[in-house]
Amino acid sequence: MSETATVGGGCFWCTEAAMKELAGVNTVTSGYAGGDIDNPTYKQVCSGTTDHAEVVQIEYDPTKIEYSELLEVFFATHDPTQLNRQGPDVGTQYRSIILTHTAEQRATAEAYIEALNDHYDDAIVTEIESLERFWSAEEYHQDYFEKNPSDAYCRMHAQPKVEKVRETFTEKLT
């Protein structure tokens, strides 16, 4: 049994690395969603002119991890109050976004954000939209943190997120 979740919380390398730590997650694919051109390239998305977001698509086993648990990790590993930026990455392609696949996912995401709002000084700006289209990113983006652990960006931004998942969500790890 497999279900799909799609989220974006800044650079997809970081979100991919964090989600891959979780038991019940079968695959995590970095890619692009939204936007107004088909099959965008990284260069096009980074230009900020296509309205795509960097996202990850997560195939998971709902008997081992629930959608709400994926949301818990998603919100713990990025700042949902930052509009169109995460850390050093600025632009609409780095926005906080949940792209739902079902009405149930949408309801869960809306309820989760409503409950979480009281825990932040600033309003949560995470967008919730129905997923219309997803394109896998170029191959060199897939498993980027795993393949490039000593990359300076990965050490500064992805590694702390992975460590947070390992320390905070020990019962959910692979």
Swiss-Prot record:
It holds the Pfam family PMSR. One of its GO terms (biological process) is protein modification process. It catalyses: L-methionyl-[protein] + [thioredoxin]-disulfide + H2O = L-methionyl-(S)-S-oxide-[protein] + [thioredoxin]-dithiol; [thioredoxin]-disulfide + L-methionine + H2O = L-methionine (S)-S-oxide + [thioredoxin]-dithiol. It comes from the Archaea. Its EC number is 1.8.4.11. Has an important function as a repair enzyme for proteins that have been inactivated by oxidation. Catalyzes the reversible oxidation-reduction of methionine sulfoxide in proteins to methionine. This is Peptide methionine sulfoxide reductase MsrA. It comes from Haloquadratum walsbyi (strain DSM 16790 / HBSQ001).
